[in-house]
Amino acid sequence: MADLIFQDWGLINYDEALKKQNDLVEKVHTEDLPGFLVFCTHPPVVTVGRATQAGDVFSWNGPVVEVTRGGRATYHGPSQLVVYPILNLAHVRKGRKDREINPYLKVFEDAIVDVLKTYGLTGIEGRSSAKSSFNRADADDTGVWVNDLKIASVGVGVRKWVAFHGAAINLTFDEKAFLGLRPCGFPSEVMVSLEQLTGAKVDVGEFKEKLKRRLLEVL
């Protein structure tokens, strides 16, 4: 159902992107639009969600932004593709009724899983029965995993029944990413990139096109 409006913001500071998200949330609510699908990339920044705990950020020396999304602390940076669906949850979609959040999250994560399949990878969404070898008892179970490694972090917020925030997908390897924090409550070693998993250079444009096509089909 390709009725979302797609925008690619390119490289954009997190604060500016958050303001633009908030503006789109108001637009979707006021005009009763289906929503927007936004792709972008951020300079290095750590965001802390509503469930962040003491000790999640312990030696990160870059900018930190408090946000209203669910989940805990995570990193955003140039090695990632960040995806922000600004979605009107009051509109019924295939696979979910109106004003349902968890079914939306599953569809969102499963779309990322579907794209990973095209790279020969078997991903699984975070609330499945699959468990990491890392201790998950006190960690955030959202996101997309390949075996016991996490390739995508997912956290959303909802205001006026419009979903915003979204996912950060690790595409290329950056040894400095996630240092000084426990992303989503896990040790930083749990995070992995598409480049590491495939052992090949990632065509970012190709990945973006695949994910854009899939998300516009299912959201």
UniProtKB/Swiss-Prot annotation:
Swiss-Prot/TrEMBL catalytic activity: octanoyl-[ACP] + L-lysyl-[protein] = N(6)-octanoyl-L-lysyl-[protein] + holo-[ACP] + H(+)
EC code(s) of this entry: 2.3.1.181
Role this protein plays: Catalyzes the transfer of endogenously produced octanoic acid from octanoyl-acyl-carrier-protein onto the lipoyl domains of lipoate-dependent enzymes. Lipoyl-ACP can also act as a substrate although octanoyl-ACP is likely to be the physiological substrate.
One Gene Ontology MF term: lipoyl(octanoyl) transferase activity
Other facts noted in the record for this chain: In the reaction, the free carboxyl group of octanoic acid is attached via an amide linkage to the epsilon-amino group of a specific lysine residue of lipoyl domains of lipoate-dependent enzymes.
This protein's UniProt keywords: Acyltransferase, Cytoplasm, Transferase
Keyword ATP-binding listed: no
InterPro entries registered for this protein in UniProt: aa-tRNA-synth_II/BPL/LPL, BPL_LPL_catalytic, Octanoyltransferase, Octanoyltransferase_CS
The organism's taxonomic lineage, starting at the top: Bacteria, Pseudomonadati, Bdellovibrionota, Bdellovibrionia, Bdellovibrionales
Site-annotated residues for Lowers pKa of active site Cys: 150
Family according to the record: Belongs to the LipB family.
Name recorded for this polypeptide: Octanoyltransferase
Originating organism: Bdellovibrio bacteriovorus (strain ATCC 15356 / DSM 50701 / NCIMB 9529 / HD100)
Residues binding substrate, per UniProt: 69-76, 153-155, 166-168
Catalytic-site annotation from UniProt: 184
